[in-house]
């Protein structure tokens, strides 16, 4: 069979764009199959990238030469670092984006990607031979051959839009859903469910009374997502803050029965951490107000995205409650809000590569795996694209551990625990978050990316230059030291134990900055500012990271205890029916992964460990 493509990616959203670009960077002849070129890179919901936990994912995507960080930098019109007053481990870079600029930059980035073709059409069926995907069949009957395929359907998989009693089949407002592909996947026996998400009404900024609203300014020193972005060139704009009122809540309560979520029309679970305004009013009935961020959708666009009031109430009810909100008394609605319900596949159907267990060569990424958010989708797309290309080329799987990336945390959570509601990334999900900071994503991942072959020449050169500069700076610091008495003469407070301390160790002190040390040793002034900032962060965390390193090494020992594919869980006596069923379904690759399965007990882990050791001994 002549293979037209090595990898076919279905869908041109955030997951699909990253998957296609990643596969192509790996050298795979790649096709991005999308309904329309014009919709590639669309921001379907909020016009923003990053945030707490999410910003870490964007930096990790960038560290592996992905697109989202660079595209967000090209489109960003308000950059802010969330949690700036807290430690670097939990700071979240975020950017408000110009929708038009984002789509333009994403399409340009894909156009510049070698080995990548854009194909218009709707994926309708899979070609399967001997339990493996060999191609995609489009709705108009074209057969596209491939060695691996990545499905990134977002909310399109049998999507249905709800607004009051009005329903329509759609993947996004004004766009057809993927009905036949959903039927194909269901017919193949995948465990599927329904989830829902929502979006707020879009407002005409010219009809908003901005006087009296709180202003949210951008950071004075915008921090790019990408290490390849020298500076942010777009004008930076303000956002504004308003709030719901008692009158708003009364309108919503009086009409709650018209919400499809509360009328029973929608059965899918929505995202807990991004609830609709109806959910907020019902769940937090003691609150008289909820914050709303009025976010401009572009530099040359008067459309305003009111972040915080997604809704599926009827259009006339939306109009009524909007007019009870300060500043929106005479607002014109450009597009009413709505909820969308869609199919997802239980992510426990997946390996840690995001390849399905049922069909070889079929990878899934994004909302089809039960996640919510652009960043979560894009990160999965990157992982799926890398692994699809590796499989197509006969290479080894590319795995991300919990101890090395938020991407590893997310994938492990999905494939081990599954989802009952849309999954969102938070820093609190990572047990090693002191190591997994947004500022060191390149130090954690770019070296691995170079080995895998997904890093381009520009990033490779920039990374090597940065690492050399960091090494030089550390070398400079190691060349200077002080006794406690000498340190005291310079105003540095350390224990008077007679022990000399090097400059890097001194930098770890809470009240010591590199500027103080540069005053003592002027030679340190040759360290450039960006490297100096990184060195300071590394020094402040050094003691804690040394402790965490031991935990990580212990975890990696457990990860190295692999469970052979040949293990028959039905033959293991002493396991409960529930645990046996979960082990059969998930088929964990290691003892460490098995320990994270919901409901796993110490007794079950002991039995499993004994089995692994016995099988290992027999094989030797």
UniProtKB/Swiss-Prot annotation:
Question: In the UniProt record, which is one GO cellular component term?
Answer: cytosol
Question: Keyword annotations for this protein?
Answer: Cytoplasm, FAD, Flavoprotein, NAD, tRNA processing
Q: Which residues are connected by disulfide bridges in this protein? A: none
Q: Does the keyword Flavoprotein apply?
A: yes
Name any cofactors this protein relies on.
Answer: FAD
Q: Which residues bind FAD?
A: 11-16
Q: Which Pfam families does the record associate with it? A: GIDA (PF01134), GIDA_C_1st (PF21680), SAM_GIDA_C (PF13932)
| Predominant place of localization | cytoplasm
* TM spans (from-to): none
What is one GO biological process annotated to this record? Answer: tRNA wobble uridine modification
| Positions annotated to bind NAD(+) | 270-284
User: Where is this protein found?
Assistant: Cytoplasm
Gene Ontology MF, one = flavin adenine dinucleotide binding
Function field: NAD-binding protein involved in the addition of a carboxymethylaminomethyl (cmnm) group at the wobble position (U34) of certain tRNAs, forming tRNA-cmnm(5)s(2)U34.
Entry similarity comment: Belongs to the MnmG family.
Spell out the subunit comment.
Homodimer. Heterotetramer of two MnmE and two MnmG subunits.
Name-wise, this protein is tRNA uridine 5-carboxymethylaminomethyl modification enzyme MnmG
What taxonomic lineage is listed for the species of origin? Bacteria, Pseudomonadati, Pseudomonadota, Alphaproteobacteria, Hyphomicrobiales
